[in-house]
Amino acid sequence: MCRVDRYTSRQVAKDCLPVCLFTCLPTLIRKHLLILTAYTLLALGMSWPLALNFATALPGVEGDAGSFVWALGWMKTALVDLRVNPFQSDYVFYPLGGATQLLWAVSLIAFISIPLQFLFGLIATYNVLYLAATVVTAWGTCLLAEEILSKSTVNGQRSTVQWNPLPPFQTFLLFKFITLHATRLTRPSRLAPLVAGLVFAFAPLRLGYGLSFFNLFNTQLIPLYALFLIRALRDHSRRNAVTAGILLGLNAYIDFQIAAFLVLFTGLYAAYQAIELAVTAAPSQPASARPGSVGGGKLAVVAAVSTAAMIALVSLAVVAPLLGMLAKDFAAEGGNYIRVFPISYSAERSYDLLSFCVPNARSTFFPGTPLKIAGVNAPAKPGDESARSPDHQAFVGYLALALAAYATVRQWKRARFWFFAATLFGLFALGPSLHIFGRDLNIPLPYLALHEIPIVNHIRIPMRYGIIVMLALAILAALAIYDLQKRITHHASRIPLYVLRFALFLLPFLILLEYAALPYPIQRVDIPRVYSDLARVPGDFTVLEIPTFNWRFAALTEMYQAIHGKRILRAYTNRIAPGVAEYFGTRGIPIVVRSLRVLEGAEKGELTADEIAEDKWARDEVVRFYDLRYAVVHPDLLKPAEATAIDAYLRDVLKAHVISDKGTAVAYAIPRAAAASDKVWIDLRENIGQMYAGRGWQFEYPQANWQGKFNYVWTRGAQSEIYFVADRAMARVMKFNARAESPQRVTVWLNDTRVGEITLTDVWQDRHVDLPAHALQAGMNRVRLEYGTALEETIGVTTITIE
C-alpha cells in the first residue's frame, strides 16, 4: 500500500471514530443523547441571539436578572473565597446583615454553578445554566409523556371471536400475527413525547420568566417529580417514593412557589387516584383483590397512604436545613416580611380569561393580532409596559390548545386527570374573581380558598399557577398526537399516509413558531475592570455603590459584589425585612442614607447647606463606622445632573478622588478617617445616632418628648440592637439612659454572648452593663437588648455611652 493510501485510511478511520463510538452506545443512551442534542439546538434557536453573546450578555430585560447573577456568584464567593455562610451574612446591608433571601430562590442552582464558574466565568455560567434549565425541562417532560403513553391501554373496541381448535402451525402463525399487531398498536409514539417537551419548555409563560425570574424559569425538576410521583403511587415503589420525595424537597431549593405548586399538584393527583380507586373494580380479578372491594380497596388505600407519607417525610428531610435557616431568620426579623398580601394585591396580578388564548405582546408570529386587550397584550394606559412583563406571557398557543381539546374528547379516560389539572390551576391563575376582556365580573373563583390556606397564601401572584397549566397541556398534546398517529395509520387508504405524517412532522415547528419571541431580549453586561482590582486589595472593608435606592439599579450593582467580594450597604433582595428596609431607606443617617437618597433622586428636593455641613462634621464618624474605602458611581444609571452632583459631593464631603474612570463606572478612593478615642457616644435623637441603632427602634418625626423637657426614642419589638466599632478587644462598660412605662427586665447580649440583665423602672436614670473582653471583638460589635416580648412605646432611651 502506498503512503497516500495509508494516510487516507488513517484519516478516514479517525474521522469515522466519533460515529463508531456513537453507534456502539446502547440504543437507549443514543436515543436520549439525540433528544438532548435536539432540545439544545432548539434552546439556542429560541434564545437567539444569546448564543452570539454568550460571555458578554444576559437573557432578559432590565430588572431582576442581575440579582440572580449575584446569587450564583455570591454562593461561590461566600463558600470558596470568604468561607462565610452564604445564606446569612452582613456582607450585604452592612452592618445589620441578614438573610440573603434571594439566594433561597436558586440555592441549588447556585451550588451547582460553583465548578462551572471556575471553568467559564460568571456570565457564561449563568447562560449555560439558563440553557440547561430549558433542555432538562424539555427532556423531563418528554420522559413523563413517554411514561404516560407507554403505561396507557390502547383505546379500541373489543371484538368477539369464535374460537375453534386450530392445528399447531396455524395457531403459531395466528399468535405471531396478533402479537405483532398488538405491538404496533401499543408502540409508544416518538413524536408525541418530543412535542410534549417543546410545549412545556418553550411555552411563552416560561420564556417570559426567563426575562427576569431565573427561579421560576428553572422548572426542570417539575416533570421529573411528576414522573416519579406517578410511578410511586401506581407501583407502590419505595425507591420511586424516595426519589419523588428528594425531587420535591430539592424544588424548595429552587423556588418555594414551585414547591407549593407541586404540593397542590400532589394533592390533586392523590385525590384523583382515591376517587378512581373507589369507583373502579377489575371484573377479571377475584372479588377480594378488586380495588373497589372492601379487602382490596383497603389494601390499595393503605399502600397509597404509606407511599404518600414516605414522599412527604423524605421531602421534609431534604428541605429541613432550609427550613431551619428560615426559622432563624424569622426569629431575628419577626418574619413579617414574608407576609400574606391583601386580596386586592392578588386581584391586580391575575389573568384575564382570554389571556390563555390571546397572543402575548412579545409574540413574533402574531405581532399584529387584531385582538388587543388592555392589561393582557396591550397597554392599560400610555407608557404602560405591564403587557410585556414576564408574568403576562400566558398564551398557550392555538395548536397546543387544539391538541389538548382533541385529547380531552377522544382520549377522555387517559386525559381526564391532566384536563382537571389544567382546569384547576388555570382557575387558580385567574385570581379571586373572573375577568373577561379586562372587566371584573365579580364571580368568585377557587383562588379565594387558596388565600385561606397557611403558607400557600404567601404566593401573592395568582398568575404563577399558570406554569402547571402548561405542564398539563403538554401531556394532553402528547396524548392527542399519539391518538392521531394511530388513526392516520388506520385510515391510510383514504389519504396518502406520507401527507398525514408530514403534517404531524410540521406540528413541533408550528408550535415553536407560535411560541417564539425573537429576537429574544438580552442585556449586555460589561463588568468594569475596577472590580477585579478591588478584589485584589487586601482587607475587609466596604464598597459604596451608587446608585442603589432604585431597586433595579441595586439589583444590577450588587452583581458586582460577586467579583470584588467586599461588603456593600444597600442591596436588592426579593423580600427585605422591615428593620433593614427602615434603616437603609427612611432614616436620616448622614451621607450614606439621607444624603444619597436625595442625590440619587429617590427623595425630591435638594440637600440644604445645613445638611451638607452636618455631613462634613460626621464624615470621619461615618467612614470609620462603615469602613468605607471606595465608592463606585455608575453615571449611565443616573441623570446627568445627578451624576454631576454626586461627583461634586464625593469630592467635597468625603474628600474622595477618582482612581478609575471607564465612563460607565467611576471609582473613587475614600481617605481613611482620623483615629478616634475609645469612647463611643451615641445620642439616638441625633441623625448620626441613628447610624448606631440597628433593628428595634422607633424613630418618629417629630420625636417623642418627655413632659416638654427633652426628646427620646422608643424601642420597638422584642429586641433592639446597637452597633459600635472597637479598635481592639478590651473590657468596656455600656451606660444608657432609659425608662419604662412599667417595670421591664432587659437581658443584654454582646455578639450573641449573654453579658448581663437589668431592670428598667418608670424613672429616667443611667443603667450600667459590663462588656467583658472575651465577648468583644476588634471591629464591628453588636449589643442586643432582649425584652422577652414584643413591646411598643414602653421603653424610652436617650443616650448610650460605651467606654
What is the predicted function of each stretch?
Residues 42-137, 203-219, 345-387, 433-454:
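Membrane-interface coil-to-helix junctions
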Residues 161-162, 169, 188-191, 234-249, ...:
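Short hydrophobic alpha-helices at membrane interfaces in multi-pass membrane enzymes
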Residues 341-344, 367, 374, 507-688:
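Extracytoplasmic
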Residues 233, 262-314, 411, 487:
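Perimembrane helix-loop-helix junctions
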Residues 674-731, 737-742, 788-803:
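Glycan-recognition and processing domains
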Residues 39-45, 129-148, 190-276, 311-315, ...:
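Membrane-embedded helix bundles of polyisoprenyl
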Residues 142-153, 158-180, 187-202, 498-508:
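Transmembrane-helix signature of polytopic, membrane-embedded enzymes
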Residues 285, 289-308, 403-445, 492-493, ...:
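Membrane-interface helix-loop-helix junctions at transmembrane boundaries of multi-pass membrane enzymes
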